[in-house]
A protein has these predicted regions:
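Early extracytoplasmic/lumenal segment of secretory-pathway proteins
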Residues: 15-80
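Extracytoplasmic ligand-binding site segments that recognize negatively charged/polar headgroups
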Residues: 25-31, 67-68, 72-208
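Paired acidic/hydrophobic, glycine-rich loop segments that form the ligand-binding mouth/hinge
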Residues: 68-72, 196, 213-218, 234
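A ligand-binding cleft/hinge motif common to bilobed small-molecule-binding domains
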Residues: 77-80, 208-209, 213-231
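Short beta-strand->loop
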Residues: 88-97, 114, 142, 230-242, ...
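Periplasmic-binding protein-like
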Residues: 120, 184-189, 197, 228-252
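Mature extracytoplasmic/periplasmic domains
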Residues: 242, 251-309
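Extracellular/periplasmic bilobal clamshell ligand-binding domains
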Residues: 293-334
Length: 334
């Protein structure tokens, strides 16, 4: 894991430090629109510890939370951290901007824990140049004309478990209650799957090289695919896209709990949410952010769309994670 320390203001005198564990991407834009403005407003120095979800959470667990004040995590890893007792309880009185964000983002894991600062969705991308028959439904992934033409995220990725849920629906069962039936549907789907992927860049490359005609993806991948393949289109399936969120939480034992809550509130503000949306870094959850059609392109934006999402029960997924991974590998590891 790479640890990056920034003193964005370049000052020589000592300042309070706020240590944030986050991803490494879009660092320059986050520095410009969030880190530097926050440092200036509160007279602090932000120190970043970067890496992927799994590596950062594992490091936090091994250190029992020491050395980090705030942590950004995707949904399933947020649930893991809660179960491990790694978060402080949030004082919502310090998050006055909560009243301005969509209900789905306010307390996705309960009132004691941090809100979502962005919302994403899992849908389908397909190449109109290769497919004359449009894709409109999750069930279309099983079509005969898609043999060896699609890619889906691996089970261990953020969006991976939604493939199991989709397979359950295809067989008209609850994947949580009847996983054998759901994985039976995945066996049927395997003939259509050229390969599974772990990184969004891999999916974009497969589209660009004409290897696949369709893929299941998070919406943030679409701009990259569209740039490489202008004939690609995004589909929110008629059954609804799956919601995914990223959260910010204060780490258990942090000496800077109140400052951390100020940071979370800052990120939820209308100005910051709009700046980040316009920079195409994250989709906004603040309801006061107004974007035109071009500005909203590639983002998950608007109450109507967000209200149409299918929820994902990460608690139930985490209970079944080992079993699901094992069943998945039996199908796709061969």
């Amino acid at each position: 894991m790479l640890v990056v320390c920034f003193s964005f203001q370049g000052t020589l005198f000592s300042k309070d430090k706020l240590v944030i564990s986050t991803w490494g991407y879009n660092g320059d834009l986050l520095k410009k629109y969030i880190y530097e403005p926050f440092e200036k407003k509160y007279g602090v120095e932000i120190v970043l510890e970067t890496g992927n979800n799994a590596a950062r959470l594992n490091k936090l667990k091994l250190r029992k939370g020491k050395g980090v004040d705030l942590i950004y995590l995707a949904s399933s890893y947020t649930m893991d951290a809660i179960e491990l007792g790694l978060f402080e309880k949030i004082n919502r009185a310090n998050l006055i901007n909560l009243s301005e964000i969509y209900p789905v983002a306010r307390s996705p894991f309960g009132e004691d824990y941090g809100p979502a600062y962005t919302v994403m969705r899992v849908g389908i991308i397909y190449d109109t140049a290769q497919l004359s028959n449009p894709i409109n439904s999750w069930n279309d992934l099983w079509r005969n004309d898609l043999r060896n033409k699609i890619s889906v995220p691996n089970i261990t990725t953020t969006a991976g478990p939604t493939i199991v849920m989709t397979a359950g629906r295809y067989k008209k069962v609850d994947a949580f209650m009847q996983s054998a039936t759901a994985f039976g549907a995945l066996k049927d789907l395997k003939q259509n799957i050229l390969k599974t992927y772990n990184r969004s860049s891999d999916l974009a490359n497969m589209f660009a090289q004409g290897e696949i005609a369709a893929g299941v993806a998070m919406n943030f991948v679409m701009p990259r695919v569209k740039k490489a393949l202008p004939s690609a289109v995004w589909v929110d399936p008629q059954e609804g896209s799956f919601v995914n969120i990223n959260t910010i939480n204060v780490v258990k034992g942090s000496p800077n709990k109140e400052l951390g809550e100020k940071y979370i509130n800052f990120v939820l503000s209308e100005k910051i949410q709009k700046d980040i949306a316009l920079a195409k870094v994250d989709s906004p959850v603040n309801v006061n952010v107004i974007l035109n059609q071009k500005q909203a392109e590639g983002l998950t934006y608007g109450g109507e769309l967000i209200g149409s999402f299918q929820d994902v029960n990460w608690g139930e997924i985490n209970k079944r994670k080992k079993n699901w991974i094992s069943q998945w590998n039996e199908i796709f590891a061969n």
